[in-house]
Amino acid sequence: DNILADGSAPGFGLVADGMSGDGEKTFRELNGDVSPYDPEQAKEYYDKAVEELGSAPSEVTLLVADDSVSKSVATFIQSELVTTLGLNVVIDTKTVQGRGELMDANNYQFAVTAWGADYDDAMTYLDLWTNGTPYRGNYNDDDYNALISDAKTQTDDAVRLDDMLKAEKKLVEEDAVVA
């Protein structure tokens, strides 16, 4: 709420808070905070990455659409990365169409995008990350794809939910695709 001042709440996973889970608990209550705010751990991971790569980047570029929400989010991300990691973050602001063209061409480092649920089910978020698209960083993982494929065809609601819980954890905790 402090960043956008519009009643927004921080996200602690890919699937938005309030999405249905098992009928008694929400998806977020069942899966917990898979993306908690932890600047110390972020710094540890960054330092490990720099060590493995042999150098730190001189700068990183954050692609953002030219709208007030995207620019506010980008400014916050820039501030966090500068403060926590000491990164030089350049914000590259484009029209929505221009941002889309760069993403389609895979000509970006990382970007601010958003997705709103089409329906009250975690799958509205999770199936976006199958089969590698430029808008999702070309992420493509056979295990993730199998979990989503099984969840889409599963007739046992408990097994389907378990597949989706595992998929979100894989995407966020294991593969660190979404933060």
Predicted regions and their residues:
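Periplasmic-binding protein-like
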Residues: D1-G21, D38, V73, E168-A179
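Bilobed periplasmic-binding protein-like "clamshell/Venus-flytrap" ligand-binding domains
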Residues: L4, E52-V69, A114, T155-A179
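Solvent-exposed loop/turn segments at secondary-structure junctions
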Residues: S8-P10, M19-D22, D66-S70, V96-G98, ...
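Structural transition elements
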Residues: P10-K48, V69-K71
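Second-shell loop/turn segments in exported
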Residues: T26-S35, V64-D67, T133-G137, I148-T155
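Ligand/substrate-recognition segments at binding pockets and active sites
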Residues: D47-A117
